[in-house]
């Protein structure tokens, strides 16, 4: 009975709440958590969180030791709830802040990707990308704050709520009554239909919202100066370089001093500059002159508002925008084409290039029946008729001239594998009609061209066919429009060539001798007749003189 008493005491000493048992961590879990915390603290520069972690883990270790000893459990059970609350809340905070990481540059505790700076410090993804791209630390809000602003930043919850309400009212007043004309010409004040997506207007709204942490009395002090026009504000900003309102520094361009821009850029020294100055420096390699500064920002009309046709401002600035929108009217596009041609007419060099670019293409050739006819024919250079006659092509070639040409104009219809050129075909047809005495190797030369022995018209006919257009047989293989064009050109010729005599075969040597004898006899007879006529004239003169 006495032996069972300690067992009953140990059973009574167990907690009746099962949730409390589940919340107690084992020694292995505590060691793993301690290793994670120590590894996370290795890259941190701040030592305050390390002391807080030691204070947090000390009650947990003390609770683990006392839970293993059953004698002090009732007292520990009464003091456990406060320790559990203090131990579980930092753990949840550690999980949400990714094991206690914080950016050494901006101080944030949440980021999609943690990075390391060149010095080994832990930085967030935004600061890491900025440092990698510009080799300069990313400017943060705490870097822009003045040293005296830390004391002014410690306000009560009531003061913060009043400043936020004042900043919201200031933003609404700016967005409600703006003087922006719209249509691509923006001054950042809002009030037009397309200002909701304007980067300059959104930038101004963001800047006014960022100054919401200023106390309410500072708004009363600077409220009179905020009603001035935009041009005066930008001029003051250009003179001073930066406008300080209640401890916050308003970003302004280092070059021209403007505070309204669609995109803030940085120069080679890391100073903020506006989009216009940044693009000018990127293109020209020098700073943008301050005389080029304008009070109105002209932006691209990428998104056309739905009520653009009904607004007078959209109709006013639609024609002189910086870029044409896809929904531009045909009249605007026609006007741009007229300007383009007018510009081309002013410069003769560009006009010549433009006309050369839009030159008329040559007429197409119909190759539909090329394989059927076996010859290539163009409208301007038709083949000679001797190449199209099969009896000419089938004649055997006995030309002693070596055949050097390999390119062919018309393939042979006799079915031979070798293709002949124009020179080969002409030489073969000419040598085919030479007498057999020359072929046998005689020493006689071919006859001299004379009136009695005209030249063979074979080559002349081929040249004439090249100069003249082809007949109806060749035109039947071409496109009807091309055939009509060739007939029209043939009709407009001023002096047609005289018709050539039909081709005749060359006479032989014996025939030439007979022709010479006949010619000699004919000339002798004509001479005798002329002598007889001369004697008759002399007799008449003698009779008249007697």
Curated annotation (Swiss-Prot):
Chain residue ranges for the region called Disordered: 1-101, 138-174, 217-242, 301-332, 371-531
Record-linked SUPFAM superfamilies: Glucocorticoid receptor-like (DNA-binding domain) (SSF57716)
InterPro entries hit by this protein: Transcription_factor_GATA (IPR039355), Znf_GATA (IPR000679), Znf_NHR/GATA (IPR013088)
PANTHER family, A to Z: BOX A-BINDING FACTOR-RELATED, TRANSCRIPTION FACTOR GATA FAMILY MEMBER
Cystein-rich region (CRR) as annotated region, ranges: 180-198
Biased amino acid composition, Basic and acidic residues: 16-27, 43-56, 513-531
Record keywords: Coiled coil, Metal-binding, Nucleus, Repeat, Transcription, Transcription regulation, Zinc, Zinc-finger
Compartment annotation: Nucleus
GO MF entries: DNA-binding transcription factor activity, RNA polymerase II-specific; RNA polymerase II cis-regulatory region sequence-specific DNA binding; zinc ion binding
Induction remark: Expression is repressed by the zinc cluster transcription factor acuM in order to stimulate expression of genes involved in both reductive iron assimilation and siderophore-mediated iron uptake.
Coiled-coil regions listed in the entry: 508-546
Primary localization class, coarse: nucleus
Compositionally skewed regions (Low complexity) per UniProt: 318-331
GO CC, alphabetical: nucleus
Gene null: resulting phenotype: During iron-replete conditions, partially derepresses synthesis of triacetylfusarinine C (TAFC) and uptake of iron resulting in increased cellular accumulation of both iron and ferricrocin (FC). Increases sensitivity to iron and oxidative stress.
Reported function: GATA-type transcription repressor that regulates iron- acquisition genes through specific binding the GATA sequence element 5'-ATCWGATAA-3' of target promoters. Iron acquisition regulation is critical for survival under both iron-limiting conditions (to acquire essential iron) and iron-replete conditions (to limit iron toxicity). SreA targets include genes encoding a number of key iron-regulated factors such as those involved in siderophore biosynthesis.
Name of the molecule in the record: GATA-type transcription factor sreA
A biological-process GO annotation: cellular response to iron ion starvation
Biased composition range(s): Pro residues: 496-505
Organism, as annotated: Aspergillus fumigatus (strain ATCC MYA-4609 / CBS 101355 / FGSC A1100 / Af293) (Neosartorya fumigata)
Domain note: The conserved cystein-rich region (CRR) localized between the zinc fingers is also involved in DNA-binding and transcription repressor activity.
Compositionally biased tracts (Polar residues): 65-91, 162-172, 423-453
């Amino acid at each position: 009975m006495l032996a069972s008493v300690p067992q009953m005491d140990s059973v009574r000493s167990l907690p009746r709440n099962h949730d409390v048992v589940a919340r107690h961590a084992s020694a292995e879990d505590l060691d793993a958590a301690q290793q994670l915390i120590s590894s996370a603290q290795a890259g941190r520069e701040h030592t305050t969180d390390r002391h807080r972690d030691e204070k947090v883990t000390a009650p947990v270790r003390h609770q683990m030791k006392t839970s293993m000893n059953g004698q002090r459990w009732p007292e520990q059970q009464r003091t456990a709830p406060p320790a559990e609350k203090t131990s579980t809340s930092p753990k949840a905070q550690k999980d949400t802040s990714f094991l206690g990481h914080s950016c050494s540059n901006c101080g944030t505790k949440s980021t999609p990707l943690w990075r390391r700076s060149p010095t080994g410090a832990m930085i967030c993804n935004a600061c890491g990308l900025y440092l990698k791209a510009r080799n300069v630390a990313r400017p943060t809000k705490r870097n822009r704050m003045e040293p005296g602003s830390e004391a002014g930043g410690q306000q009560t919850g009531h003061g913060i709520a009043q400043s936020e309400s004042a900043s919201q009212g200031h933003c609404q007043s700016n967005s409600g009554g703006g003087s922006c004309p719209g249509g691509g010409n923006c001054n950042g004040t809002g009030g037009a239909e397309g200002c909701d997506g304007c980067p300059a207007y959104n930038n101004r709204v963001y800047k006014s919202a960022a100054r919401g942490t200023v106390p309410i009395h500072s708004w009363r002090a600077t409220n009179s100066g905020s009603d001035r026009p935009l041009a005066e504000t930008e001029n003051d900003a250009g003179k001073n370089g930066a406008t300080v309102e209640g401890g916050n520094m308003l970003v302004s361009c280092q070059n021209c001093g403007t505070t309204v821009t669609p995109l803030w850029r940085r120069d080679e020294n890391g100073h903020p500059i506006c989009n216009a100055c940044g693009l000018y420096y990127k293109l020209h390699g020098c700073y943008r002159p301050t005389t080029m500064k304008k009070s109105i920002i002209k932006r691209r009309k990428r998104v056309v508002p739905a009520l653009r046709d009904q607004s007078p401002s959209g109709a006013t600035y639609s024609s002189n925008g910086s870029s044409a929108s896809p929904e531009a009217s045909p009249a605007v596009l026609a006007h741009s084409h007229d300007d383009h041609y007018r510009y081309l007419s002013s410069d003769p060099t560009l006009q010549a290039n433009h006309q050369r670019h839009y030159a008329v293409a040559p007429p197409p050739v119909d190759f539909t029946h090329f394989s059927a006819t076996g010859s290539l024919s163009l409208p301007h250079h038709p083949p000679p008729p001797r190449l199209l006659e099969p009896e000419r092509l089938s004649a055997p070639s006995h030309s002693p001239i070596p055949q050097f040409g390999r390119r062919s104009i018309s393939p042979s219809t006799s079915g031979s594998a070798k293709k002949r050129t124009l020179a080969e075909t002409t030489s073969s047809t000419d040598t085919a009609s030479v007498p057999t005495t020359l072929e046998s190797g005689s020493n006689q030369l071919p006859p001299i061209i004379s009136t009695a022995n005209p030249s063979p018209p074979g080559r002349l006919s081929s040249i004439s066919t090249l100069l003249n257009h082809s007949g109806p047989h060749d035109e039947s293989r071409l496109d009807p429009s091309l055939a009509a064009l060739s007939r029209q050109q043939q009709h407009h010729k001023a002096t047609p060539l005289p018709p050539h005599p039909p081709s005749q075969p060359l006479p032989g040597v014996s025939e030439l001798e007979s022709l010479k004898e006949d010619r000699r006899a004919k000339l002798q007879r004509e001479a005798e007749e002329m002598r007889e006529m001369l004697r008759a004239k002399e007799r008449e003169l003698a009779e008249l003189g007697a």
